[in-house]
């Protein structure tokens, strides 16, 4: 009898709508983490391009160079992966079909940004890193416009 009562009560309740980027209904989304990671990719790409190999055969100089180069590459790849993860969270968890009506190029923009993240992981290419920042800014602008706000993208570097 009690089960029937509970079931009849539950049947009359409309389902709760939740919005979340995680497995909890927090509803907290912000493209700031995407910008920080993408900006780190650009910064590390610039550092890698500027890094000069030693002109001598001194093993200590080469060890220092190799260590610095390896660290820069590791950070660049890690941040490209983080950028992609954050972009995909916005795409799969925040953006809804209604956003596609207003921003019909959203899927293409996200797809290109994700592809650029992969390209930036495997290449040391300033043009690709700058293009990634450009796409991150597009996503930033779409995100805030979808919330009825116009927040300027402020770079840390």
Please state what every model-predicted region is.
Residues 1-72, 104-138, 142-157:
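N-terminal intrinsically disordered, cationic/polar leader segments
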Residues 68-78, 82-89:
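Structured binding/interaction patches within domain cores
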Residues 77, 100-107:
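Short, well-ordered coil↔helix boundary/capping segments
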Residues 86-103:
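Short, solvent-exposed, charged loop/turn and helix-capping segments
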């Amino acid at each position: 009898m009690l089960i029937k009562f509970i079931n009849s009560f539950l049947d009359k309740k409309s389902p709760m709508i939740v919005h979340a980027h995680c497995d909890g209904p927090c509803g907290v989304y912000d493209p700031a983490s995407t910008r920080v990671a993408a900006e780190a990719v650009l910064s590390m790409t610039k550092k890698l391009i500027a890094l000069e190999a030693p002109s001598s055969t001194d093993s200590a100089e080469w060890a220092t160079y190799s260590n610095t180069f390896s660290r820069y590459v590791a950070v660049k790849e890690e941040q490209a992966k983080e950028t992609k993860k954050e972009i995909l969270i916005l795409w799969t968890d925040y953006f809804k079909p209604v956003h596609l009506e207003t921003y019909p190029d959203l899927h293409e923009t996200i797809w290109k940004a994700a592809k650029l993240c992969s390209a930036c992981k495997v290449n040391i290419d300033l043009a690709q890193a700058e293009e990634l920042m450009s796409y991150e800014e597009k996503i930033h602008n779409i995100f805030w416009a979808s919330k009825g706000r116009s927040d300027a993208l402020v770079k840390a570097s």
